[in-house]
Amino acid sequence: QYYGFELIPIPMDDNGPDMDIVEKLVSEDESVKGIWCVPKYSNPAGTTYSDEVVKRFAALKPAAKDFRIMWDNAYCIHEISDTPDVLLNIMDECKKTGNEDLPIMFCSTSKITFPGSGVAALAASENNLKVLREKYNYEIISYDKLNMLRHVRFFKNYDGVLKHMEKHKKILKPKFDIVLDTLDKELEPAGIASWKKPHGGYFVSVDVYDGTAKRTVALCKEAGVVLTGAGATYPLGLDPKDSNIRIAPTFP
C-alpha cells in the first residue's frame, strides 16, 4: 500500500484462500507481482492452509516472471490447542514442481520474546537469497549479534523455544476459553454471529450480519469495550462485506 501497490483481497474459506481466483489472477495478469500469505492461523479467522492449497500455491504458473509468494509464517509455533494444526512445507512442494524461486518465507520472535527487539529468520532459494543479500548490504552494516546471542543463550535450542511457547499457551488458553465460552453463551442462542475456534494464533474472528461490523464495534466502544477496528485485517482496512470483527483475547 505504501509503495503504491494495488491490494486485492482474496476470499478465504476453511482451507485457505480461494485458489481458483488466485490461479486466474496470477496466470492471466503479469501486473500481479506477488501474494502475501499468513499460512498458519491466518488472520482473521485462524485458518491454516490445507495441503491442497499449499500444493496449488507450489504449482502456480505466474504470468509475471518475478512473481513471488510472501510466506509470512508469523504464528508457526503459536499453539493454544493440544491438537495443533499441521502446515505443509511449501518449499518442499515447490521443489517438486520446479518452482523453488516462488516462495520467500519468513518468521520472527516478535510474538515469542519482545516485539521490535526479537530475531527474524528468512528462507528462500539461492537465487532469491542472492538478490536479498545484495539489497541488505545497503540497508544495514551489521546485524545485532548481541541480541542474537541473547536469544540463543535464553532458548539454547529448538526444544527450548517450544518449552517457552508452552508457557505462552498456559497464559493464553484460559483467555481464549473465556472469549469463546462467552460467545457460545451470549451470542449463539441469538443466531446473530458466527465464529471459529482456532487451534492457535492470537485472535478470534467473529462474523456478524453484512454491513454491521463497524456499527457493532462503535456500540461496543460506547459500552466501554474497545475492539480492533472493523476491517483491520483487510487490504486498505476495507472489509467488502463490513461483517468481520477481530477479537484479541491476548489484550488485556
Regions found by a protein language model. Give the residues of each.
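Short amphipathic alpha-helices in soluble, non-transmembrane regions
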Residues: 216-222
